[in-house]
Amino acid sequence: MIPNNYHELNYSKIATYLFCPFLYKLKYIEGRREGLVAVTSLGVSIHKTLEEYHTNSNDPESLLVYYNRCFLGAGYSSAAEQMEYYLKGKRIIEDYAKREKYRQSEILGCEKEFIFEHNGWKFRGKIDRFEKLPDGSYHVIDYKTDARISDNFDVTKSLQLALYTVGTKRAWGKTQGKASIYFVALNKIFSIPFEDVNEDLVLEKYMEIGEKLEGTDFPPCTKSCIQCLFRMRCPHSIHPERHIKFHKL
């Protein structure tokens, strides 16, 4: 079955395939959904809060109002777990509000989408925050709500920021600036200047993987099972407690 957005590439597709080709098949070809768990639910709540805040207010005093309005109650195993994560998110938002008082950038858009075409492929991305800095350059920001940073994290190798940089240049004509991953729970920002991104290499990498997405071979990557939200239902899962019966959500 060929999905409707065949020949379209985005970072989520690429990241999913690199994590596990079989997971890509489940999500993007068969249309199965992962569902929410506590960590991902809080991530959705934080992202939505910051989008609503920067779109409608930019007054730090209003951030908690937006958080309470945007907090998502789904994905928690109990009321106690929901409260635990609500309080975690509240602390993240309170700390973010303190930092907001000193921000000097101009927010140009949140969840801002770019689309461009190259060699028969359509590239698409959605940027959490796009802003103009006091020096006139531009700043692309992707929020992460992780509580820790992976030991092998290297911002210079981020395929996500690389595509966002290329998209910012090609779709919007903004050539001066930087792209960043902002770990909001940890108040850490990792950036790469636009000029450090080799556009040709980035597009070549995406198209190389894109060719594989059009194939029929999607082998499982069992070393990823422990981190996969499908691990209890996937027929290839090596998770010891997975369900025997695999079914659609």
Predicted regions and their residues:
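RecB-family 4Fe-4S metal-dependent nuclease core
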Residues: M1-L249
